[in-house]
């Protein structure tokens, strides 16, 4: 495992209020998606009917991004209204879809290490079988926190 040094989502998104919903793994997924869209020369118009297939990890290492729980109770002073969004597996896909203008099928796959590959396979099948003409597929996860 190698650390990701100096990762700053703002470099990819600029001012972007949805950033507060993302855990580190979801931020990596969003950055990768934006890189893929820009690198592929795709526009929001081209992606409007595209599908989105995102693989995510199981969030087993919740690091310091989630409220401290002691004796089955959350420390209320550390809980903000949106904390649950950083834990839900489909938050990354939702934010990617909004950022890229994708309004087609949206699927989140949570099969641990194989999640991104499973997402890519699902996108391939949808295109091969004629359900979609275009899809963005991949994943993101993080087991380490800075």
Where in this protein do the model-derived segments appear?
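Short, conserved beta-strand segments within well-ordered enzyme catalytic domains
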Residues: 29, 51-55
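Acyl-thioester C-C bond-transforming condensing/cleaving domain
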Residues: 38-49, 57-146
């Amino acid at each position: 495992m190698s650390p990701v040094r100096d990762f700053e989502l703002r470099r990819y998104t600029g001012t972007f209020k949805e950033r507060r919903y993302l855990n580190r793994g979801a931020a990596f997924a969003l950055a990768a998606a934006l890189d893929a869209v820009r690198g592929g020369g795709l526009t929001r118009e081209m992606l409007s009917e595209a599908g989105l297939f995102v693989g995510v990890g199981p969030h087993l290492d919740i690091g310091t991004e989630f409220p401290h729980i002691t004796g089955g109770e959350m420390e209320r002073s550390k809980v903000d209204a949106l904390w649950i969004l950083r834990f839900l597996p489909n938050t990354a896909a939702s934010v990617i879809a909004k950022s890229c203008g994708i309004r087609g099928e949206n699927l989140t796959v949570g099969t641990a290490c194989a999640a991104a590959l499973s997402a890519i396979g699902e996108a391939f099948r949808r295109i091969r079988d004629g359900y979609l003409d275009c899809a963005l597929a991949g994943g993101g996860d993080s087991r380490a926190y800075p």
